[in-house]
């Protein structure tokens, strides 16, 4: 069968399926997501650089943790000249609020209550994505945004299909061995590690 769970590479399987069904030789894995430019402009509150922080995720074992995001923000010398969109769901609302309380609402906004159709406009307005593997990272990379994905128990295939995807994994870990059962310690990815990866984009 084409789709089987064991050793499944999601992107390659979907690519093969699409090529077969549409009878085409090469199906690109980069796409284009269109937005309403007027809706995007209406969201612009200031001229600060915009960063999406993907603090939410599908489960606790894939999250880097709100305290790490607070420390990362403070690591930037110019963080008061950056606006952070905190991408998360209702379950992470409290984590988002803790970040806002620490950093200040003039530099943070939670997207916990936004629809996906609205979230894509916030991403379009932003410069880069930093965060957990989440739907936001997939949308961001397909909108041409540099994405820095913190991988703790996410297989390689989830960040293997776009030139905009940049992986951050714990030192000494082979990305080919990371699976949904890896449950790597979030604190093995240091603040400095993430900062050094993204600083040239800030």
Residues covered by each model-derived region:
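Catalytic machinery of carbohydrate-active enzymes
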Residues: 1-202
């Amino acid at each position: 069968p084409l789709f089987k769970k064991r050793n499944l590479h999601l992107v390659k399987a979907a690519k093969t399926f699409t090529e077969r069904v549409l009878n085409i030789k090469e199906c690109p894995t980069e796409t284009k997501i269109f937005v309403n430019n007027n809706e995007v402009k209406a969201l612009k509150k200031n001229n600060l650089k915009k960063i999406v922080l993907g603090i939410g995720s599908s489960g606790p074992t894939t999250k880097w943790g709100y305290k790490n995001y607070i420390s990362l923000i403070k690591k930037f010398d110019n963080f008061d000249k950056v606006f952070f969109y905190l991408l998360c769901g209702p379950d992470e609302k409290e984590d988002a609020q803790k970040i806002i309380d620490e950093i200040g609402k003039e530099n943070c906004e939670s997207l916990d209550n936004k629809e996906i159709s609205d979230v894509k406009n916030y991403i379009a307005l932003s410069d880069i994505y930093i965060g957990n593997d989440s739907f936001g990272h997939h949308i961001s990379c397909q909108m041409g945004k540099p994405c820095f994905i913190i991988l703790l128990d996410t297989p390689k295939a989830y960040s293997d299909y776009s030139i905009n995807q940049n992986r951050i994994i714990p030192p000494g870990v082979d990305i080919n061995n990371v699976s949904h059962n890896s449950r790597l310690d979030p604190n093995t990815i240091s603040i400095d590690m993430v900062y050094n990866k993204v600083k040239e984009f800030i």
